[in-house]
UniProtKB/Swiss-Prot annotation:
Assembly information from the UniProt record: Part of the 50S ribosomal subunit. Forms a cluster with proteins L3 and L19. In the 70S ribosome, L14 and L19 interact and together make contacts with the 16S rRNA in bridges B5 and B8.
Alphabetical keyword list: Ribonucleoprotein, Ribosomal protein, RNA-binding, rRNA-binding
SMART domains found in the cross-reference section: Ribosomal_L14
Function text: Binds to 23S rRNA. Forms part of two intersubunit bridges in the 70S ribosome.
Family affiliation: Belongs to the universal ribosomal protein uL14 family.
Coiled-coil ranges (or none): none
CDD domains recorded: Ribosomal_uL14 (cd00337)
Designated name of the protein: Large ribosomal subunit protein uL14
Molecular functions (GO terms): large ribosomal subunit rRNA binding; structural constituent of ribosome
Example of a GO cellular component annotation carried by this entry: cytosolic large ribosomal subunit
GO BP, sorted A to Z: translation
Amino acid sequence: MIQQESRLKVADNSGAREILTIKVLGGSKRRYAGIGDIIVATVKQATPGGVVKKGDVVKAVVVRTKSRVRRNDGSYISFDENAAVLIKDDKSPQGTRIFGPVARELRDNDYMKIISLAPEVL
């Protein structure tokens, strides 16, 4: 589960390497974000020459979480790290490449561009 002050790895080539969660979108009392949820975050580490800089406030969608997620068939999926992909206001990714696997649950939330860019969908 991702909440305020959670640090996530960035799984794209937008220039950010690590982000810190400011807010979970989707209601005033919403505390946790899971796979496919949108968060507002600030960039804590960035690569030189990237599109985003350290200190920028960005929107991101969570693509991997350490906490396990239950699927409809009864199976569970979890990852080794918490990761997100930076998105624009129209839900399209800021970067042109996605690193690492992403969860199949993104398909339910209409993130087809992220699914198509990902090297592996679990």
